[in-house]
A protein has these predicted regions:
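The feature marks proteins involved in alpha-glucan
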Residues: 1-61, 66-73, 80, 489-496
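Surface-exposed loop/turn motifs at beta-strand-loop junctions within extracellular Ig-like
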Residues: 4-8, 103, 527
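Substrate-binding/active-site clefts of carbohydrate-active enzymes
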Residues: 23, 45-54, 63-233, 497
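Conserved alpha/beta catalytic core and glycan-binding cleft of carbohydrate-active enzymes
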Residues: 210-212, 226-386, 412-467, 471-482, ...
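Catalytic cores of secreted or luminal carbohydrate-active enzymes
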Residues: 396-417
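C-terminal beta-strand-rich structural cap/linker in extracellular carbohydrate-active enzymes
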Residues: 494-527
Length: 527
């Protein structure tokens, strides 16, 4: 540690802000660590990685300490968990792992979002080399790794960056600017020294640990003072974000992903800095998440009055490159898990959750799910407990898990569902206005095929329901959320619907489809 005699005469022991490693909490001293590692074998992966605009991106967000516990061990180890984790991720057709923050932090309950060591990998889960091993193994298996990075605020603990020499070095000098809503200190992003510190830290994780991207936390608190639009734009912080993204893109030749967690409607977040934007590649679509879950919490009797909660996302979707997410924030603090947010009985919750995920995986935009979503987790996430893996011994959860993996397989193998996500030509509503029936239908358009997606968020079965389509030919059912192998009640062969030349929904052809209660249907037509 550094022993610093401050201007007031107070003597304080501080960690090294640039340390590569630290003691395990509650101890706080910095540790000298050799970062050289001669076992990297991911050269081919690094050469071929890119931002993935025309690729499938299906992210598994996880808290490494609570995914799967080791017996009699307080913490899992990066190296020990690597092969098991990577095998699981591949089996479920995820393309990337997103690790919640791994910068050192003192308080377990902050999940890593209240950092103390911006160059120090948390010692909870092993050594620097253990983390390198995990990333290297993921790359060898064709899995990308993204890390959460927190460039807006830091812990106020005495041993850390706060009032490092007795003055406001890293934070704003005025308390009303420095104090964040989380009880942490806001970085003074107007200072060149602070900007350099954070840009160096961002580069460090990509250079040293080969991360494929950074998900930037709390960007709304950089755009606006305290994240509050009424307080105005924080121009200094905004300029920092633009410069950091510009330099990261320049340094890594546009090959790493920069993802913004931003809850505001501030424009041009994913526009290039050359064109006046912030320079991110993707932005979490928190509006879509909120609107969709709000709709599905409601009794179906009242959903027709909130129909636009589902349709509104496509009104603004092409303004940014959005990433559709159900993250850790949606399954904590009394909000209930995804399946438990669904209205209805046990069986109805599962049925609606299956239809919800069909909607998610066929909606334009890249995908992210927090660990446990794929299990239909009932219990809210708790960082002290592992996932409830025992749920897979229950038929409903096991079937849902298989269904979730099938959606991932379908999404990652079908270019129509990902290649032109951000082109308006890839999506067309069939009927966005059937509020009385709680029905939604749209087309995902591709070069080789089209997909027709039908979503029924009502408890009514609609037999021989008519939908307009663009192409003639045979429409074959690829997936039905009510097939019994996925936990539904339907034991029937796939529907084959022949399009006839009758105009419907302003389309030249029409098909008749049986749509199950609380169910979704996915049909394919070849071109």
């Amino acid at each position: 540690k550094y022993r610093i005699t401050q201007a007031t005469g107070r003597v304080v022991d501080k960690m090294d802000p640039y340390a590569f490693y630290s003691e395990l909490r509650p101890n706080t001293a910095s540790v000298v660590e050799d970062l050289s590692w001669d076992r990297w074998s991911d050269e081919e992966w690094l050469a071929n990685r890119n931002k993935g605009f025309d690729r499938p991106i299906n992210i598994y967000e996880m808290h490494i300490g609570s995914w799967m516990k080791e017996e009699e061990e307080e913490f899992v180890n990066y190296r020990k968990i690597a092969k098991k984790l990577i095998r699981y991720v591949k089996q479920n057709h995820f393309t990337h792992i997103e690790l919640m923050p791994l910068c050192e932090y003192p308080f377990d309950g902050s999940w890593g979002y209240q950092c103390s060591g911006y160059f120090s990998v948390t010692s909870r889960y092993g050594s620097c080399h253990d983390l390198m091993y995990l990333v290297n193994e993921a790359h060898k298996a064709g899995i990308g790794v993204i890390m959460d990075f927190v460039p807006v605020h830091f812990v106020k603990d005495d041993f850390s960056l706060s009032y490092f020499d007795g003055t406001a070095l890293y934070e704003y000098p005025q308390a009303h600017d420095a104090d964040s809503q989380w009880g942490t200190a806001n970085f003074d992003l107007w200072k060149e020294e602070v900007r350099s510190f954070l840009m160096s830290a961002a580069s460090f994780w990509i250079d040293v640990y080969h991360f494929d991207g950074l998900r930037m936390d709390a960007i709304s608190n950089a755009i606006f003072w305290h994240g509050n639009k009424q307080l105005g734009v924080n121009e200094g912080a905004l300029n920092f974000i633009k410069r950091m993204n510009f330099l990261l893109n320049e340094r890594y030749q546009g090959k790493i992903m920069l993802i913004a967690e931003d809850s505001t409607d501030f424009p041009n977040v994913t526009k290039s800095t050359f064109d006046g934007g912030l320079g991110f590649d993707y932005k979490w679509d928190l509006g879509w998440m909120n609107d969709t879950l709000k709709y599905l919490k409601k009794d179906p009797v009242y959903r027709k009055w909130h129909h636009n909660n589902i349709t509104f996302s496509m009104a603004y979707f092409y303004s940014e490159r959005f990433l559709m997410e159900f993250s850790h924030d949606e399954v904590v603090h009394g909000k209930a898990t995804i399946i438990n947010k669904m209205w209805g009985t046990y069986e109805q919750k599962f049925a609606q959750a299956r239809t919800l995920y069909l909607y998610m995986f066929t909606h334009p935009g890249k995908k992210l799910n927090f660990m446990g979503n794929e299990l239909a987790h009932w219990r809210e996430w708790d960082e002290t407990k592992e996932n409830d893996w025992f749920l897979l011994s229950y038929p409903a959860h096991d079937a849902f898990h298989q269904y979730f993996a099938k959606l991932g397989e379908l999404y990652t193998s079908e270019p129509t569902l990902y290649a032109n996500d951000y082109s308006w030509e890839s999506f067309e509503w069939i009927d966005a206005d059937n509020a009385d029936k709680n029905l939604f239908s749209f087309i995902r358009k591709g070069e080789q095929n089209d997909y027709v997606v039908i979503l029924n968020f009502s408890p009514n079965h609609y037999a021989h329901e008519v939908f307009g389509v663009l192409q003639k030919g045979m429409y074959t059912e690829i997936l039905n959320t009510e097939w019994n192998r996925y936990g539904g009640t339907l034991d029937a062969p796939a529907q084959k619907c022949h399009a006839i030349r009758v105009s419907r929904n302003n389309k030249p052809f029409m098909i008749e489809v049986d749509v199950p209660a609380f169910g979704g249907v996915l049909l394919e037509v070849k071109k």
